[in-house]
Amino acid sequence: MSIMRRILCLAVVIFIINDVSSQGLGNNKNWKKNGMSLSSPGNKKPTGNNAVPQKSKMNNMNQNSLSQPKRSSPPGNSMYNMANQGPMGMMGGFGMGMNNKQMREFMIARRTHGVSPFLKKKICHMAKVAPPVNGQMPSPPQLYAQGFKIRRIGKWFSQDLDWSEGVAMCHNKEMEHRGCEKTPSSKWGRMFPGMGGMGGMGGMGGMMMGNRPMASCDVTKPNSCGNPALMKCSKYHKDRFGMPVCCATSEMTANQLENMGF
């Protein structure tokens, strides 16, 4: 019994010491808040055996607070959250709600100038249009008839101009497909800002088509946009005057023109 009593008393003493030391640290914090430090003449310095442990404990606390960096979000965390929100957050204008795997598939489809079956189905589903048996997009007039507006889908272009325009149908009617040229010169580009697409290909259009007020073209003439390998006359994209406009034939062409500053 005597051993048990000693152990119990020792535990009580340790508890009291810990409680007193914790209160002492709390008082030290209050002293610092009031503008006083432990070393000021008006305060008594801690003496006895508790002085060293208290000082070392506070030093350890300060060192730990200095040595441990502040917690911050991992690099790219905002992009990760944006990616989880779908391309609307990541790319700024898709709004198709694709997850990361679907997004990678979409990017591969862009780089290879191809269209994955998933992308076709996703676009048709987004447009609330049942895809035909052959898996192709409905024609733009059909989408127009259903009241669907045109929207851009980014920088993606197809070698097939009709499919490229079909993709463009899934975005906003006020914004033309990025490859569809509407301002062939910097003069008209300043007068009509934003009409030449994201890259602004007016200068190249002006060199290929001459000094026209707008980049209009004739759908019955294959060469009305200059080099048919670079630009084609669109049957569906029209300027604000109702005239057909020239479109880049591929993403590569559009990117080349954009890199040249147009």
Curated annotation (Swiss-Prot):
The lineage of its organism: Eukaryota, Metazoa, Spiralia, Lophotrochozoa, Mollusca. Residues 26-35 have a biased composition (Low complexity). Residues 26-84 are annotated as: Disordered. Its main location: secreted. Residues 36-84 have a biased composition (Polar residues). Residues 1-22 form the signal peptide. Keywords: Secreted, Signal. It is found in: Secreted. This is Methionine-rich nacre protein. One of its GO terms (cellular component) is extracellular region. Expressed in mantle and, after secretion, incorporated into acid-insoluble nacre matrix of the shell (at protein level). Expressed primarily in the mantle with highest level in the mantle pallium and lower level in the mantle edge.
